[in-house]
């Protein structure tokens, strides 16, 4: 039910600006709903989420609005002159733990945050895109996390098989099955 409301809100905002990545935002709506409403339940200062697929930031903003971390007016000003919220998350804004945008950089930041927070037993959650798995820096972070025994990282890959020019499975068939890559 919440996911449906989130999608309606995304569409409502998309009528006013052209900078929304609808496909990527819609495909991770349920993922974001579960992370923010079942795992990040409290407002603990050290609870941490990184939207590695930064182009889908609008869903994060809408959830932060629902949680009264962002104001409705701030979300209404998404990608508008005078607004604080852009297409990609900026850690200078309330509820945003890392500035992301260029695919492939988010998981490295997650590894750094996890290392810093391991002693405090704080978990770092992140959503990656399947297209982002084409980036070498993502795989460096994927290998670094277990090497440093960072058991306080939860990564969810939005495996929607979509990217800018063609299906992810067509451009990089070696990625599939993705689940197997995380077990090797």
Regions found by a protein language model. Name each.
Residues 26-147:
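Cofactor-binding active-site loop characterized by glycine-rich and histidine/acidic residues
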Residues 12-22, 91-97:
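Active-site flanking loop/helix segments enriched in acidic
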Residues 50-52, 152-159:
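Short internal beta-strands
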Residues 122, 170-184:
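Conserved thiamine diphosphate
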Residues 5, 23, 27:
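N-terminal glycine-rich anion-binding loops that anchor highly charged ligand groups
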Residues 165-169:
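Short, surface-exposed acidic-centric catalytic microdomains
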Residues 3-19, 158:
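N-terminal capping segment at the start of a domain
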Residues 134, 161-164:
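Short gly/pro/ser/thr-enriched loop/turn and capping motifs at secondary-structure boundaries
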């Amino acid at each position: 039910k919440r996911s449906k409301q989130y999608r309606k809100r995304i569409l409502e905002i998309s009528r006013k600006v052209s900078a929304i990545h609808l496909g990527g935002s819609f495909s991770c709506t349920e993922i974001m709903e579960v992370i923010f409403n079942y795992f990040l339940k409290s407002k603990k200062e050290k609870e941490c989420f990184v939207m590695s697929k930064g182009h889908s930031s609008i869903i994060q903003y809408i959830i932060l609005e629902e949680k009264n971390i962002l104001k409705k007016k701030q979300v209404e000003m998404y990608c508008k002159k005078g607004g604080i919220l852009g297409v990609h998350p900026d850690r200078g804004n309330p509820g945003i733990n890392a500035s992301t945008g260029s695919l492939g950089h988010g998981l490295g930041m997650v590894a750094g945050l996890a290392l810093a927070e391991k002693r405090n037993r704080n978990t770092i959650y992140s959503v990656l895109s399947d297209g982002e798995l084409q980036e070498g820096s993502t795989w460096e972070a994927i290998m670094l996390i277990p090497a440093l025994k960072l058991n306080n990282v939860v990564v969810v890959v939005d495996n929607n098989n979509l990217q800018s020019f063609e299906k992810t499975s067509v451009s990089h068939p070696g990625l599939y099955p993705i689940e197997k890559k995380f077990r090797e």
